[in-house]
Amino acid sequence: MNIYLKKFIDEKFKKPGKALDLGAGEFFDVACLKQIGWKCEGVDIKNGVDLEKNYESKKKPFDLVYSNYVLHKLKNRKQLIQTIFNNLKNEGWFFIHTFDKSDKNSKSDLSQVYLKKLLMEQGFKNIKLRVFSFYDNDIGHKHWHKILEATGQK
């Protein structure tokens, strides 16, 4: 499981709730959350959900909506931010990881300023952003990334 997502959950939630993973990939985070008692739904292009378009779950609203390493790939980034907002319950939390524009190993043009603007325009509150370095130790990678993290509430 994304260790930063786990830390965020441990800080913000006293007990398991409902979560939505936008861009779930191999559904690893979904499986990990289920193991610790969360009710979790994951969607991805692999199961027919195009995040360039609006997605509203039949299981909404969620306590947590998160997306890891998807936003920088999308052309319609405002749509993903709106999808997060529309699937969250009031006072629910979001968590986003993507690559920062300073990352030399990805093709991202995202900055803290731009992402904060998108989030504020959508109506999110308690927004926190940070950029940090992370060593990607996966097979065939072995390099550093600059991660852009955004969290906040509806």
Task: Describe the residue ranges of each PLM region.
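Conserved beta-strand signature within the Rossmann-like core of class I S-adenosyl-L-methionine
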Residues: E91-F99
